[in-house]
Amino acid sequence: MKNQRMLGVIGGGFMARAILSGAIGKGMLSAEDIIVSDPDAGSRDYFENLGVAAVSDNRRALACKYLLLAVKPQTFSLVADELKGEHFPIVISIMAGKTKKAISAATGAGKIARVMPNLPCSIGCGMTAVDATMLDADAGHFVLELFHAVGEVIEVAPLPEIRL
């Protein structure tokens, strides 16, 4: 089962660190289940110290069953342009203001969960809103489990007027 849960991450900033530290710390994922791509050597060093594979090539993260998009919304277009034409796995986006429609249009991804964690995730006391309505039951369960590792989770339905 662990091999099916391989998680690729693009973006190794604060929220990615909090989420992955929680998932590893709670035993939801092992460090060997994860690969993180980040252009910053310091970020890669942080993850390598956790035992996580860390690379600078975003394409390596696409080889996983799940992809956590943890980049700043303003840099998403650069990442999407770089990966245009690639096959995307199930996407979990923590980018504020980027709709599933926009992510799909930019990447071609067909299965996307939008997630909005908050800063207390870094100490395991977060509250995360999850819209996993595009995912099947197993993938939705994975997303919920991932964010339960860093706090409480509330499932939300997609509403056009809500911009997570």
Predicted regions and their residues:
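Short acidic-hydrophobic, aromatic-tinged amphipathic segments that line or gate anion-handling sites
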Residues: 53-59, 154-156
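Internal alpha-helical scaffold of NAD(P)-dependent oxidoreductase catalytic cores
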Residues: 102-111, 127-164
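NAD(P)+-binding Rossmann beta1-loop-alpha1 motif at the extreme N-terminus of oxidoreductases
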Residues: 1-56, 125
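Rossmann-like NAD(P)(H) cofactor-binding subdomain of soluble oxidoreductases
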Residues: 35, 41, 50, 59-128
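Short alpha-helical
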Residues: 14, 41-42, 74-75, 98, ...
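Phosphate- and divalent-cation-binding pockets in alpha/beta enzyme and binding domains
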Residues: 18, 46, 78-79, 102, ...
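Predominant activation on well-ordered alpha-helical scaffold segments within soluble catalytic domains
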Residues: 20-21, 77, 104, 144
